[in-house]
Swiss-Prot record:
Cited Pfam families: Oxidored_molyb
Job of this protein: Part of the MsrPQ system that repairs oxidized periplasmic proteins containing methionine sulfoxide residues (Met-O), using respiratory chain electrons. Thus protects these proteins from oxidative-stress damage caused by reactive species of oxygen and chlorine generated by the host defense mechanisms. MsrPQ is essential for the maintenance of envelope integrity under bleach stress, rescuing a wide series of structurally unrelated periplasmic proteins from methionine oxidation.
Biased composition (Low complexity): 1-22
UniProt-annotated location(s): Periplasm
Protein name as annotated: Protein-methionine-sulfoxide reductase catalytic subunit MsrP
Post-translational modification: Predicted to be exported by the Tat system. The position of the signal peptide cleavage has not been experimentally proven.
This protein's encoding gene: msrP
Binding-site positions, Mo-molybdopterin: 120, 123-124, 178, 213, 265, 270, 281-283
Amino acid sequence: MHNTFTHTKNNTHTKNNTQAKNSGSQTKSNAVSLNKPRKLTEADVTPESIFYQRRKVLQALGITAATLALPASAQADLLAWFKGNEPPKAPSGKPLTFTPSAAYHPDLALTPEDKVTGYNNFYEFGLDKADPAANAGTLKTEDWQIKIDGDVVKPMTLDMDYLMKCFPLEERIYRLRCVEAWSMVVPWIGFELGKLLKLAEPTSNARYVAFQTLYAPDQMPGQKNRFIGGGLDYPYVEGLRLDEAMHPLAFMVVGVYGKTLPPQNGAPLRLMTPWKYGFKSIKSIVHIRLTRDQPPTTWNLSAPNEYGFYANVNPHVDHPRWSQATERVIGSGGILDVKRQPTLLFNGYADQVASLYRGLDLRKNF
């Protein structure tokens, strides 16, 4: 396990890229005009380097041009045929004891559980949305520990059993907005990140919080094979400003739909920051470090012109290759049952978090 944050990512390597995502105090004069939504292709919603790496894998297997015209899900099925042995099935989640929160959108219609657990981005287990559910059974979550260090008074290493007993668990129904312009509504179970950080007592030098995912190539095929993992450098890392991390909305998740997290959703511990794009909500966390300097983040290092440090949901600031004005709602229907809705500033949490970004230029700090 590499408990370090001093690595670099792939593609364009830029230091101290302080691009911040969408901010809260945007006025009408500061807003960007909305583009007319257009139909997205797979190339639109997948980073270009990853899109073409996927094609190289298929071509290396001798797959024809006709096959390349198939949807990504069909290509994934074809690749699975070449694999031979199926990965082990993920264990069923264990029921959790928790208190439903009345303060966090109990009126929202939930995304079906099979979609929440079967439609994921977790490139450590493959590029297609069904890959994590199919391949994450190899993840071993027994004896999991989380290290907290850096600019803290009390550095510590905690195990999951302690965390589950240390904080009362609550269920919060949060909106989830992916940077790829799709969305869900999910009943997460967990506790506030700020409560965890207070255990370690951040010092006055601490300004940022850095997070790191497990690094285990023997369990995560995308870490072992760059084609499977989209060409990213691993382990996956993310970061928040300390005031963001201490905000009550920042949530450490241990369960979903009444049970412990399945591996494909980031077991046993993940972050959820509902006002930011989904890639900020790092999965399978093993290391949290408080730091004075802004930490590197995986997608910003991979494509700094496309993915900023802040990653706040903002319908007025488009991705370079697609509009963020609307989003596709993942529901119970199939491919022909497509519903789109307007994207809300800060994913609908502007009243709670806009003050964090007062005076910040949303176009530069995306």
